[in-house]
Amino acid sequence: MKFIKTSTGDSYSNAFLSSFAEDTRIGHGIASQEDARLLQEDLKQVYLWAEQNNMRFNSIKFELLRYGKNSNLKDSTEYVSNTGEIINAKESVKDLGVTMSSNANFKEHIGKVIDTVKELTAWILRSFRSRSPILMMQLWKSIVIPRLDYCSQLWNPHYVGQIQELEQLQRYFVKRIAGYQDMDYHTALKRLGLYSLQRRRERYQVIYLWSIIEGKVPNIPATNNTDLIKVHTSIESRNGRTIYIQPLKTGRYQTLRFNSLPFHGARLFNAMSKNVRNATQLSKDAFKNILDMSLKLIPDTPLLCSTT
């Protein structure tokens, strides 16, 4: 079933709705029992829409993911499916290929990415005798890199251990290329024309935020029905275009937010050179070229494990 009802109608003013392919999502920030009631009302409106269009949701596939530290509110609120069954909350949910956990980190997803890349790397090394740089780079870029890049703007880790573990995947592969076995990792990356994986993830964050402020992709919605990504200073200003960074208090969840795309990505964007930040009315490929020229001037020194 494909959900094609837009979220701009009055019937769904309490929550946000989104749809992709056969998946439909409905969400609401819950701060009280009244918020929970409003979310259930919006769920009923979605069920009613499906019934009026001779369609129905599969209640078996309903998934509920809760974020936040208010355990009392979590335990005292329930939501029901179109069949009247209680929707059970889950510790993690896979959405469009990304595993999201109720503790608001991506440890489980990163672990799955690492396991998948290790399997693909082992398959490549078993299946191909040649270790020539050209062949190995074609295999790495076409088979493995897409798994490491997919949605990395969202799950980009900030824990040193996770950054090192991910970087070790590429380091291991580079060491298996003919002529690069004993070469320093950073030197090998330059000769092979590769970025470190950490640099790749940061690069994609900058590209995505540029796409948002250029209007090429939708903005990130905030809880007060406003856009989360906002331009702080314009191109005409002395320092060039920058993104506004909201102040945050200390705490566990604030730390996670501090390292998320709207905050960490915004700091990266603001740290770029003025010609990168002021690039406008360009194609994405043209912006990537400008960004890459600027990144060449910044040392690419990722965190590495001590073992090979």
Residue spans for each PLM region:
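Mobile genetic element proteins and their domesticated derivatives, centered on retroelements
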Residues: E22-T24, A50, L64, G97, ...
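Basic, alpha-helical interaction scaffolds
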Residues: G84-L154
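Conserved, non-catalytic sequence blocks in retroelement Pol enzymes and Pol-derived host proteins
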Residues: A31-L39, A104-V113, S127-Q138, N156-L166, ...
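Catalytic palm subdomain of template-directed nucleic-acid polymerases
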Residues: T24-E51, P157
